[in-house]
């Protein structure tokens, strides 16, 4: 595809995967793989990197950590922080941006374990048609135009 890409993460495993797939990796001490990560910094760096790279992967792990720790309220609070920072980011970045939001797996906060529920996927931005879904969760997105699909199909849907 000829895209130059970068991955912003605080997680060593994701850094390794990014490197193997040809993405550059951006990490700072403030960008952790935990609930204390500096989301403002991550989104700021993502915005700066969009000016230099065609693809920016912004990895945020805090929700998974809270779920593994069986702390659903912390998971909810962290999701709200992500939502707030994403909202600020989208107000600044009004260019021909395309955005995919998803997860690599679901984690049940009650038991702290991974589960095989489908993960929600949101595609947003230039050239992507909206649908009637107004809430982003595992149940509501099943009513959207993407429906259920295998994650290996995400790339094709993103660039369709």
Which ranges hold each PLM region?
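Feature captures the catalytic ectodomains and active-site-proximal regions of enzymes
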Residues: 1-160
